[in-house]
Amino acid sequence: MSMYYLMAQLPSLDGIGENAPPPITEERFHELCHCFLGKKAQRNLDRLTLAPPRDFEKSGSSLINAWNTAERDLRLALGKMRAEQMQKNFDAGDAAFPVGILQAARTAVEMENPMEAEKFLNHYRLEFLETLRPMDMFSEDSVFYYGLKLKLILRASRFDTSAGKAAYRNIYSSILNGDRLEVLS
């Protein structure tokens, strides 16, 4: 019953434009969730991330596991393709990437404008997340879906062209100098 109360209090994230602010803050979302979720679900919620490590711990949620696997694979594919483009080595492990992830990574790497590449990747991530959307709107996985979507929307709302150029130059220099700042932890 508590899941009904929680989901009924969350504003819809559907149809939010690229530059529109989200209708709820991440802090408020977490406050509401901590009132209604059990301890295990709260732990899973607190571990939601847009940047999972290479060797992430499996959660009790198939949605979180699918998200972490796909996001890790996307980041590794991007790293590998960017390194190949600059004729550098990149250890992507023994990963065999799904075709959709390879196509998205290739498209992003081929884009000349880093901001457009980030917008493309964010759109790709939102589309992928939509494929994971649970049928049951009142399940824990629906809360995790909402949390990940909110994180992606918040991330997109923070895109800043000048800061992006500075970060791009920093990562590019890191690759050329072998500092490996671009590598997943």
What are the language-model segments listed below?
Residues M1-S185:
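Extended alpha-helical surfaces
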